[in-house]
Every structure is written in structure tokens, then in C-alpha cells.
């Protein structure tokens, strides 16, 4: 009898099971990659929406100016504090938007406020708009149209509290701590394109600085001449003494001349050293000025490069697109390979 692993039927079953495993693995890889790509795209969309919301909010805030203002709700016809004051958050805000003024306040237990109306000193009803209605916190932010100079508002409200069967309408007056002030216009966002700084052109030196040549004064040696000996005696002894005196004076004259020559050389030598030192220092100063000018030119040339780099926008989204394309391509190739193997094995089994 032939062994089971040599049986052709057994081999075909093993092949079909292997193909099923490969197909299931490929399908799971494709599904996993699609789920990952979908989650990544959702995160990108959420981040984009959050950024847009932040930008819109910052734009709205920049278009309006506000200032806090304190107030108190008092009973009608008296200066006694009303219970309505406890259901409003303090302080309020004075807002100027689109050249219009609003008094903004937040109502606590907003579900109790069935009706609220505000009137000015001339008993004219003021427009009221809801800015934010938070059902979870049970608060409501409202804007009441006002004008600069208003000191108080008359309020007519309808409050219903089902838990205690409270259902009443009453009139109160809202007193501001100070009159509604006049606010400055909001600073509009600057849409002016930034001016690119132009590199300053270095000034070309027109005249080259020449080293100053120090003036050297020639020192004239002072030679002292000895007086002539006029003793001319007739005796021989005296003439001998005079000749000796003349030789001594000549020797002294030559010695003094040599000393004065040496002193002149000594004077000329330090003067020359001072002149050379000054010329070297002047040349070094000129070279330092040139190096500073070249450094300034290089710095000014680098500034437009940095500005151009700042202009470049960050390349966002390219990495995620590349990952998406590579993943889809890999999954497609794997699926095609598994299908081709499956078709090939079916042909062999037939």
C-alpha cells in the first residue's frame, strides 16, 4: 500500500488547504492595511478641522474688542438686591463688534428662564441674541444691544422652576457699576505682505589710506673747538710744551667728533623704529576695516536667503500620501499573486 503522503488526493487536499491559508492571510493583510489607512485619514481630517476652527475663532476674536463690567440686579422700585442676580454670572462684558455695542452676560439654570426682555431708559426694547446655549452645563450666553452711556437696563423675565412649582413674571432693573464706555476699534489682521530687507551695498573706498610718514629731524652734532694756543715763546722748552698741548687738543677733538657721530646714529635708529611701527599699525587698521566690510557684505547676503527660507511653506501630507500609495500597491500585488496561484493550482487539479 502506498503511504498517505504519496497519495495524489492527499497532496491535492494539502495544496488546497495551503492556498486557502495564503488567501486568508492576504485578505487579512489587505483589510488591516485599509483599516489603518482609514484611521490615519480620519486623524488627518480631525486635525485639519481643529486647525480651521482655531483659525476661525482667532479671527472672530480679533474682529471684536471687549471690556469687563460689573453690575447688580435690583428689585423694581428699590435698591435691594434681587434673586435674579444670583442666576447671572459676574462680571459681564461690553463688546464692540462691527461698530455696534453689546452687553454680554451668562445665565445660570438657563432652563428656568422661559422669557427675558431688556429695555433702555426710554422703555424701548433692546435686541437680544443667543451666543451660546450649553445644554449640558445648563447655561446660556446672550448679547443685549446697548449704546455707550447706558447706566441701567430694565428687565422683564418669566421664571419657571418645576421642582418647587415656581412660575412667576416680574420686573427688575440691572444697574451697571459705571456707564457703558466707548471702546476703541478692534485691530484688523494685517494682510500686508512683509517687506523683504534689501542687502545694503558696501561703500567702495574712494581713497586708500596711506600710512603717515613721520618726520625725522636731523640732529646736528655740536662740535666744540678748542682755543688756539698763542703762546709763542722763544725758548725751546716752551715750544716743546705748546706742541704737546696741540696734540692733546687734536686728540680730544677727534674723540668728541666720534662720540657725536655715535649719538646721531642712536637718535636716527629709534626714530626709524617708531616710523616703521606706525606704518605697520596703519596697514593693519586698513586690513581690519576691509575684513569688517567683507563680513558685513556676507551677512547682508545671507539675510535674503534666510527670508526666502522663511517664506517656504512646510510640505504637509506628502508622507501620508506616499505611505498610502505604497500600501495599496503592496496589497494589490499580494492579491494578484494569490489569485494567480489559486487559478494555477485549480488547473493542475483538473
UniProtKB/Swiss-Prot annotation:
Q: Which residues carry this modification: Pentaglycyl murein peptidoglycan amidated threonine?
A: 316
Q: What is its main location?
A: secreted
What are the GO cellular component annotations? extracellular region
Protein induction: Repressed by fur in the presence of iron.
Q: Which InterPro entries does its entry note? A: IsdA (IPR050436), LPXTG_anchor (IPR019931), NEAT_dom (IPR006635), NEAT_dom_sf (IPR037250)
Named from the GO MF annotations, one term is: metal ion binding
Short sequence motif LPXTG sorting signal: positions: 313-317
User: Which residues of this UniProt protein bind heme?
Assistant: 75, 82, 166
Could you tell me which residue ranges the NEAT domain spans?
Answer: 62-184
Q: Where is the composition biased (Polar residues)?
A: 252-268, 278-296
**Compartments reported by the entry:** Secreted, Cell wall
Cleaved propeptide residues:
317-350
Sequence ranges of Low complexity compositional bias: 203-214
Enumerate composition-biased segments (Basic and acidic residues).
Answer: 299-314
Please verify whether the record's keywords include Heme.
yes
Signal sequence, start to end:
1-46
Membrane topology field: Peptidoglycan-anchor
Q: Which UniProt keywords apply?
A: Cell wall, Heme, Iron, Metal-binding, Peptidoglycan-anchor, Secreted, Signal
* Known outcome of mutating residue 101 to A: Does not affect heme-binding
Q: Write out the similarity annotation.
A: Belongs to the IsdA family.
Other remarks on record? Expressed in vivo during infection or colonization by S.aureus.
The record comments on the domains as follows: The NEAT domain is responsible for binding Fe(3+) and Fe(2+) heme and fibrinogen. The NEAT domain is an inhibitor of apolactoferrin activity, while the C-domain confers resistance to bovine lactoferricin.
Instruction: Summarize subunit and interaction data from the UniProt record for this chain.
Output: Monomer. Interacts with IsdC. Interacts with IsdB.
Can you say what this protein is called?
A: Iron-regulated surface determinant protein A
- State the species of origin: Staphylococcus aureus (strain NCTC 8325 / PS 47)
Upper classification of the organism = Bacteria, Bacillati, Bacillota, Bacilli, Bacillales
